[in-house]
């Protein structure tokens, strides 16, 4: 016992507070409990999270995984001392990816690295993760909080995670079924989402003069740049799952880093191209402000940001209205922005 106490004291002297870790776990348990579903087989604290697979009715169940983080959006959360929504971003970046395959999220695990474990802050972060899990129907079955003194400043942290989903093999989206004349539907984004923040910090000189982002901005309808930037990434899982049950979806793209030019082609087969009507895209004011302030060419903006479109979905032209009705009923701002055309050169054209 004396040896253990001595070891703990030495660990604390090195900057790792074990007691804070225990307290953080206790504070986050209420958040985690919100995410429990029928697949959960154990409580928080075990060495591994156990989850029963819901494979009834599936011929060939396939697990689909995705991992991601929030990029330097975390820096904004730290600067604003607002940590209760950044976890939504971490979940969104993963579950929005796996839904592009047609997979329903089952569970999520998070990883937080921090300079100093402040239990209340960690609980806020995990509270956001839990909210993202609730929005996507995933269970938060585990995670890790690692205290890294000497490696990270005390106030800093990073957040990442991974999601696992399931889909029947025959229902995995197959882009080779896409055809000329199919329609491209846009799902509106909630804002910047979770990429391009290093450029944003440079454009608005946030690191040198952070006070500017807290002033109300006319271009943003009176909102501050800060609150606009920190708006959580929209989670599309439940609306897209409803769509998949009723419409012959040919392809889905999650518009993240690389914008339209990098992400839309990922769901387009060779020989076809998504022809996007630039005038149809509902560009959010924050993107116009970034472009104007940073003197950034429009193509570069569409090659970096979602520009107001968080996801694109390709459906047969004959099913467009059905798709729009379903998506609207589930709270999405959905509209047609283009069509699929033949092309052996480019896979996406904006004009």
Predicted feature locations:
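Short, acidic (Asp/Glu-rich) active-site segment that either coordinates a divalent metal cofactor
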Residues: 158, 171-225
